[in-house]
Amino acid sequence: TICRTHVIIYPMTENEPIKTVSDGITFLSTGRYYDGINRWVAHKLKDGDNDAIDYAARQIAKLLPQNAVLVPISGHHGKVEQTMQLARAISSYTHLPIVDALRGIERESQYDAKKKGQTLSAEDMGFYKYKDLPSNRTPYLIDNVVDTGNTAKAAIKALGCGTVASFAMSDTLLQREE
């Protein structure tokens, strides 16, 4: 018996940069969350894996202009943690300044709330501007993954302006904008 297999080759679109605008805020990402290894890398970022941080930083660095200032988005503990590690790694490639300008209240994570079928509001996150930004630079808020965009939107609202740059973006925000 002879078995034949058919191989279908799809064009590679993995890790193509994404740019979308939602509620007047620009979101940039290195690729879709569910493409290739992005989901795995995103989980490793949350674990603080140095190789994942370095990989994500190199990808995000390609998206940023020379006049950017990196602003890590604070996590559910109210302070920057994983996003600061990522911002430092990005800065090591780009030499862009980092300003720890945002704080928030300690809260449940957006990820955990979503698993319960809930979404945190801007008020739940309690973001506020903690430090001033240089006036000659454009703020780029750094996040690991953007899903609904609600966290980033609340952070930008607190800062007053900025663009969001993330490693991966889920289809949730993209489907809202189609």
PLM ranges: what are they?
Residues 3-68, 103-136, 170-172:
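Active-site-facing substrate-recognition patch
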Residues 62, 88, 92, 157-161:
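Short, well-ordered alpha-helices that flank and scaffold nucleotide-derived cofactor binding pockets
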Residues 67-76:
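Short glycine-rich phosphate-binding loop at a beta-alpha junction
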Residues 68, 139, 161-164:
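Hydrophobic anchor at the start of a short beta-strand
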Residues 72, 141-142:
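Hydrophobic Val/Ile/Leu positions in short beta-strands of Rossmann-like dinucleotide-binding domains
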Residues 80-96:
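Substrate-recognition/cap helix-loop segment adjacent to the acidic, metal-dependent catalytic center
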Residues 142-155:
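A phosphate-binding catalytic loop at a beta-strand-loop-alpha-helix junction
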Residues 153-157, 161-178:
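A short, conserved beta-to-alpha structural element at the edge of catalytic cores
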